[in-house]
């Protein structure tokens, strides 16, 4: 699966490189890394050296930069390796919405959002269970 990784400067570049190589070992083809902010662990020049993975700058406009990267690189998914405080949950969901609107999955540690299915509806009845609470399938 071809992915664009979201990274930040709040992690040491060595750790980010390890995360990218682990992603590659898990079957992801990392096309590029999009830097979404943070510079705590970067050098004076704020350079983010991720080896063979090209780094795209998205600190000023992460949503626009992600949209452009998805369109240009034709990624299948966005792999979120960033963390707070660089990306708040609100900002993370905005980036997920950008990816999903362009037909890309949004993947992170312990979660995956897939874009809506745009195929024609099935010709047979279907059922869905949503909004279940803690008392589902229990007797009271």
Which positions does each model-derived feature cover?
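Walker A (P-loop) phosphate-binding motif
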Residues: 116-140
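Low-complexity, flexible helical/coil segments
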Residues: 40-43, 114-120
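Long, basic/Gly/Ser/Thr-rich N-terminal segments
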Residues: 1-107
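Short amphipathic alpha-helical surface micro-motifs
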Residues: 61, 108-112, 138
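Short, acidic/small-residue loops that bind anionic groups at enzyme active sites
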Residues: 96-117, 130-132
């Amino acid at each position: 699966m071809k992915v664009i990784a979201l990274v930040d400067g709040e992690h040491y570049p060595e750790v980010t490189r390890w995360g990218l190589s682990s992603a590659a070992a898990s079957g992801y083809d990392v096309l590029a890394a999009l830097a979404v902010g943070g510079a705590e662990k970067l050098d004076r020049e704020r350079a983010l050296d991720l080896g063979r993975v090209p780094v795209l700058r998205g600190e000023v406009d992460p949503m626009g930069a992600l949209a452009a990267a998805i369109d240009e690189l034709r990624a299948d998914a966005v792999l979120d390796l960033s963390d707070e405080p660089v990306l708040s949950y609100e900002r993370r969901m905005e980036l997920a919405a950008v990816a999903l609107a362009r037909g890309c999955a949004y993947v992170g540690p312990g979660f995956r959002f897939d874009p809506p299915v745009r195929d024609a509806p099935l010709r047979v009845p279907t059922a869905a269970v949503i909004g279940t609470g803690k008392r589902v399938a229990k007797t009271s």
